[in-house]
Structures are given as structure tokens and as C-alpha cells.
């Protein structure tokens, strides 16, 4: 499949789905084949920076020192210090709300061990363990990059669902995002394109359109 096939599918999705009263996300479903997902080494677990962004904001949490917190102010959505780790360890319900609301977590490297010990039971199963950042490093570039990054995780399934943008985004930009994702995933598969059964594009509430055939599902 090439960029033209992808663009046709994206445009078909837009045409077939009525306008909603909210901004719909656009996502792809990548169906794999001939892969043993019971073997952990075959599972896909990728974070992919989209060339044209996600089209909407996602929330990023940072744990750090006063210096790191000051640098992250106005860019990160939740900013916490070392003292908040023990607070959340005692109030897991409050922490779970934040975890469910945020997409990525960052933590100063010196705090990682404490976070893993105190909050790992909440973060780990959700695939949201923090990315470590060295003390003193400016977190802003990483935060901005993560806000344009998506996760592609198969776990033990042969289907990956990955957000690629929003309906209001230009079709070409959405298509380029999809191409970037497919290139990354294909590069991780033992047999490349031969391990991909098919790819569908859909909006939040719309019908799925298969890339390359135009079939709806």
C-alpha cells in the first residue's frame, strides 16, 4: 500500500461519516497475520512521533525537583515533586484519575526507583511508567515531542489500534502520519509487509474503510 491508497481511504472515511458535534479522532486498525503473539519478543510496543502531530492535545505528567518543575510550568499538564509520590502512594484512587487522564509520564531519573516502588502497580499495567530525564535537563522539548507521539501496542493481540489525527486535519497530513506508523511497524515485523493482513481507517463513530480496497466494515 502506498500514500495514495491511504489518502483515498482517509477521504472515504471523511465522506462517509456525518459531521459530529465534537472533534472526532481518526485512527487506524492494523491487522497482523502469521505471528505468534504468545511469544513476547513478537509483540509490538512502539512510541511513534507523528510528522504532523495528533491534531489535539494530550496530557503529560512530570515528577521532578523544583528546578525541573519550574522549567515544565506552562508546558506539562500535571507537575509534581518528590513529596507527591508518597502522597499518591497513600491515595491510589486520586492517582488513578490522573493516570487515566494523562497519556505520558516523565520523571527525573533520581525519582524513578521511588516511583517504581510506590506507584508502579498503577502505572505498569497501564503502560505508563515514566520516561526518565536527567537532573537539570530542560524537559520542554521532550514534553512537546510526547504531545505529538502515539503508542502502538499489540500486547497479545494481532490487531493494533493507533490514533493518527483528527477529522479536521488535512487528508494529506493524516495520510503522512499513517505512513510513518506503518513504516515503523513494518520494520519491527519479521516478514515486514507480509505480516500485515490489512489496514482500516475510521473516525471515532464512523465506519471503517480498508486501505487499498475501499471496503467498509
UniProtKB/Swiss-Prot annotation:
InterPro entries: Ribosomal_uL1, Ribosomal_uL1-like, Ribosomal_uL1/biogenesis, Ribosomal_uL1_3-a/b-sand, Ribosomal_uL1_arc, Ribosomal_uL1_CS
Keywords: Repressor, Ribonucleoprotein, Ribosomal protein, RNA-binding, rRNA-binding, Translation regulation, tRNA-binding
Any one Gene Ontology cellular component term annotated for this protein: large ribosomal subunit
Keyword Zinc: no
Record Pfam families: Ribosomal_L1
Keyword Transferase: no
GO biological process: regulation of translation; translation
GO molecular function: rRNA binding; structural constituent of ribosome; tRNA binding
NCBIfam families the UniProt entry points to: PRK04203.1
Assembly and interaction partners: Part of the 50S ribosomal subunit.
Record's function text: Binds directly to 23S rRNA. Probably involved in E site tRNA release. Protein L1 is also a translational repressor protein, it controls the translation of its operon by binding to its mRNA.
Family of the protein in this entry: Belongs to the universal ribosomal protein uL1 family.
Protein name, per record: Large ribosomal subunit protein uL1
Species per Swiss-Prot/TrEMBL record: Thermoplasma volcanium (strain ATCC 51530 / DSM 4299 / JCM 9571 / NBRC 15438 / GSS1)
Amino acid at each position: 500500500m502506498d500514500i495514495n491508497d491511504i489518502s483515498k481511504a482517509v477521504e472515504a472515511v471523511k465522506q462517509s461519516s456525518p459531521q459530529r458535534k465534537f472533534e472526532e479522532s481518526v485512527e487506524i486498525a492494523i491487522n497482523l497475520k502469521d505471528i505468534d503473539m504468545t511469544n513476547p519478543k513478537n509483540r509490538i510496543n512502539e512510541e511513534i512521533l507523528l510528522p504532523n502531530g495528533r491534531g489535539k492535545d494530550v496530557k503529560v505528567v512530570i515528577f521532578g525537583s523544583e528546578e525541573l518543575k519550574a522549567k515544565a510550568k506552562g508546558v506539562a499538564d500535571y507537575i509534581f515533586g518528590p513529596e507527591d509520590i508518597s502522597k499518591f502512594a497513600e491515595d491510589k484512587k486520586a492517582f488513578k484519575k490522573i493516570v487515566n487522564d494523562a497519556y505520558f509520564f516523565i520523571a527525573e531519573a533520581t525519582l524513578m526507583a521511588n516511583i517504581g516502588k510506590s506507584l508502579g502497580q498503577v502505572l505498569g499495567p497501564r503502560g505508563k511508567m515514566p520516561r526518565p530525564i536527567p537532573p537539570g535537563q530542560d524537559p520542554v522539548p521532550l514534553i512537546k515531542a510526547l504531545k505529538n507521539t502515539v503508542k502502538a501496542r499489540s500486547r497479545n493481540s494481532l490487531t493494533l489500534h493507533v490514533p493518527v489525527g483528527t477529522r479536521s486535519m488535512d487528508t494529506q497530513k493524516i495520510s503522512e502520519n499513517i505512513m510513518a506508523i506503518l513504516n515503523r511497524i513494518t520494520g519491527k515485523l519479521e516478514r515486514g509487509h507480509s505480516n500485515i493482513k490489512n489496514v482500516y481507517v475510521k473516525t471515532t463513530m464512523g465506519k471503517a474503510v480498508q486501505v487499498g480496497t475501499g471496503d467498509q466494515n
